[in-house]
């Protein structure tokens, strides 16, 4: 009598020779009528599909750095088109995410009365209009900053205005505060909060007290001024509009692409501006926030340039202390073109605009060290930004005085896996030194 493969298995009487026979003959994928073959085919297909799906959606997968990102750059020779494509993918949840994102405790950091799960943030400029906040957080960031946002919609500077320097892992931009304006960004934020409240994940809105809508993560909103706007009133309008949506408010006075903006960094002008911003923020505390809190007092940070002499940095430190802001982001892009640039196209290098990416690191780190010296003991929180592309870079900034760090350009070049890699590298080095992130902040400040 001839038994089927399944019946032999059920009888427990299949030997090695019989198994090989059935594997070669009865379970051949060509025999579509055999139930065992169909089951095996579907099982293998489902398993392979699941594994492929996990691999492709996991930001740690090497394919994103070595295939996906280079392919996007190849398909979008216009750098701004590539930027827009990236935001579109993040907005609709099509970008890879960091699966099993649980940060080790030694990465936790207390800042502004909150505990962040990790100190790695996304700098402003990636998501200018608050369209892709959740997609960015899904990459593993502890802090995401959107903007800059201007009161009225404005197109920014004429195109082309965004240029890649891939050999240097750098970009030059002269966007000029292109923004959809306050009302449009508020609508994006309102829709996001509404989706959160109505989702089945939100059983108790009071369980989340951060406006990022994530426990132990913060959302910053970077405020700018219109090209022909008032240098004080535009920022006050931003505070009034976004106070109830932001965990952190950032005053951007350092973009090189808005005429006269960097002039706001002069001590007397900056002290006046920041003092009025803080006063406006304090006047709105009792207005609460969109999550129903009765009071809300988001910290105010000011973002400054790296192209400053020591006396200018000292003056900014004094302005920050006098105005009682909560911190300083060091730094924005640079108008310098460092000698270290290896891009051979001199016309490309000579494009007007701010340079960001790896070549910015020496300038931003130097500015941070100087700022840390002049703010030591003041309680001001320093955020390091500019050219950070590794865990070693992040630790260098922390030891120079940064409580948190931000990155953007290298994230665009290396892909979504960079965030996990940076956190892994920080963790490994901290373990070697037998320290936590909090313990190394300002370690080298003199």
Curated annotation (Swiss-Prot):
| Function as written in the Swiss-Prot or TrEMBL entry | Catalyzes the conversion of dihydroorotate to orotate with quinone as electron acceptor.
Q: Quick one: which gene encodes this?
A: URA9
Indicate where this protein resides in the cell.
Answer: Mitochondrion inner membrane
Organism phylogeny: Eukaryota, Fungi, Dikarya, Ascomycota, Saccharomycotina
Entry protein name: Dihydroorotate dehydrogenase (quinone), mitochondrial
Please name the source species: Kluyveromyces marxianus (Yeast)
Q: Where does FMN bind?
A: 124-128, 148, 222, 252, 303, 331, 357, 387, 408-409
Name the active site residues.
255
| Membrane topology annotation | Single-pass membrane protein
* Cofactor(s) the record lists: FMN
């Amino acid at each position: 009598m001839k038994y089927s493969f399944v019946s032999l298995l059920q009888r427990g009487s299949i030997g090695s020779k019989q198994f090989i026979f059935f594997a070669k003959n009865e379970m051949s994928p060509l025999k579509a009528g055999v139930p065992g073959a169909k089951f095996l085919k579907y099982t293998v297909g489902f398993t392979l599909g699941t594994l492929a799906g996990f691999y492709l959606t996991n930001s740690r997968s090497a394919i994103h750095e070595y295939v996906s990102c280079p392919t996007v750059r190849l398909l979008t020779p216009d750098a701004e088109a590539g930027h827009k494509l990236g935001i579109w993918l993040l907005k609709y949840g099509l970008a890879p995410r960091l699966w099993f994102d649980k940060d080790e405790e030694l990465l936790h950091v207390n800042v502004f009365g909150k505990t962040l799960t990790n100190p790695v943030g996304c700098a402003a400029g990636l998501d200018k209009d608050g369209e892709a906040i959740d997609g960015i957080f899904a990459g593993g960031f502890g802090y995401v900053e959107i903007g800059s946002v201007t009161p009225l919609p404005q197109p920014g500077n004429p195109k082309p205005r965004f240029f890649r320097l891939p050999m240097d892992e750098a970009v030059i931009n002269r966007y000029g505060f292109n923004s959809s304006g306050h009302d449009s960004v508020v609508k994006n934020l309102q829709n996001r909060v509404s989706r959160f409240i109505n989702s089945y994940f939100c059983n108790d809105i009071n369980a989340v007290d951060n406006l990022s809508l994530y426990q132990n993560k913060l959302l910053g909103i970077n405020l700018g001024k219109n090209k022909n706007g008032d240098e004080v009133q535009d920022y006050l309008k931003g505070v009034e509009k976004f106070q109830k949506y932001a965990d952190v408010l950032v005053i951007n006075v350092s973009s090189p692409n808005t005429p006269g903006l960097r002039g706001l960094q002069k001590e007397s002008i900056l002290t006046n501006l920041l003092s009025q911003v803080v006063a406006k923020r304090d006047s709105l505390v009792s207005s609460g926030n969109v999550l129903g809190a009765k009071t809300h007092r988001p910290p105010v940070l000011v973002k400054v340039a790296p192209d400053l002499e020591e006396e200018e940095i000292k003056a900014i430190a004094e302005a920050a202390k006098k105005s009682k802001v909560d911190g300083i982001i060091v730094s924005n892009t640079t108008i310098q073109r460092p000698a270290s640039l290896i891009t051979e196209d001199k016309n490309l290098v000579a494009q007007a605009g701010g340079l960001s990416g790896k070549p910015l690191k020496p300038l931003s780190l130097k500015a941070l060290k100087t700022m840390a010296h002049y703010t030591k003991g003041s309680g001001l929180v320093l955020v390091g930004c500019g050219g950070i592309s590794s865990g070693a870079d992040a630790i260098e900034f922390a030891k120079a005085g940064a409580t948190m760090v931000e990155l953007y350009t290298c994230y665009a070049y290396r892909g979504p896996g960079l965030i996990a890699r940076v956190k892994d590298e920080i963790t490994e080095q901290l373990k070697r030194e037998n320290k936590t992130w909090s313990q190394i902040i300002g370690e080298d400040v003199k």
